[in-house]
């Protein structure tokens, strides 16, 4: 949506508020709480996930940080998939979503939530090493945030097609027009043109992998 994109740009330009992850605590959260937060604060909304963690503020340490009354308690959410056993016997999890509350940059937030997930999974499902993989949207990021967390590049994914109303509004993954009943009404002539929609492509994504317990 327009307001979300504008808030993301403001944060990228250093115009948003800051919250320090050291002033927050990590808690597991439920499906509904994660979905509500991600629908409001992630460009692609929520996604199916098995593990969901939230970052909750409990204090502010002053200069350079948003006041406690200027943000809600839940300021960031990370969601991870169910583990999948690889051919070598290790488990692989996907980091499906990460988002901070609109207009706020959480300094150290990605690392705090990732560490919580890794600690939660260590020694479970499959003993020994496991991996966390994710995709970086090249429209917004170049992967450096993930590299700082220890992720390594593992290839590129081609651009993805979306349908978008010409008068604005949220873009819809092209595949959802046929697979998601919420959007089937847009398919009047098989292309979405009946609803004045245009086909656009993003710039693709970068695959990254973090190897844990090695």
Positions of PLM-derived features:
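Extended, hydrophobic interaction surfaces within ordered domains
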Residues: 1-10
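A conserved beta-strand-loop-helix scaffold within acyl/acetyltransferase catalytic domains
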Residues: 8, 15-161, 168-169, 202-211
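A polyampholytic, Gly/Pro-enriched intrinsically disordered region
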Residues: 11-18, 181-185
């Amino acid at each position: 949506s327009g307001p979300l994109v504008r808030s993301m740009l403001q944060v990228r330009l250093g115009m948003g508020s800051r919250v320090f992850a050291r002033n927050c605590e990590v808690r597991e959260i439920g499906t509904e709480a994660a979905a509500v937060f991600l629908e409001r604060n992630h460009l692609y909304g929520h996604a199916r996930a098995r593990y969901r963690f939230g970052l909750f503020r409990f204090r502010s340490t002053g200069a350079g940080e948003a006041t406690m009354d200027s943000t809600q308690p839940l300021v960031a959410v990370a969601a991870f998939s169910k583990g999948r056993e690889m051919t070598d016997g290790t488990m692989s999890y996907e980091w499906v979503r990460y988002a901070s509350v609109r207009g706020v940059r959480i300094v150290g937030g990605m690392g705090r939530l990732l560490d919580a997930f890794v600690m939660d999974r260590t020694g479970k499902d499959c003993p020994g090493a496991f991996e966390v993989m994710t995709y970086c949207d090249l429209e917004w990021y170049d992967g450096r945030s993930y590299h700082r967390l220890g992720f390594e590049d593992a290839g590129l994914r081609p651009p993805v097609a979306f349908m978008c109303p010409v008068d604005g509004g949220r873009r819809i993954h092209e595949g959802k027009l046929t697979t998601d009943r919420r959007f089937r009404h847009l398919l009047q002539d098989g292309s979405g043109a009946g609803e004045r929609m245009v086909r656009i492509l993003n710039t693709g994504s970068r695959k990254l992998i973090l190897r844990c317990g090695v």
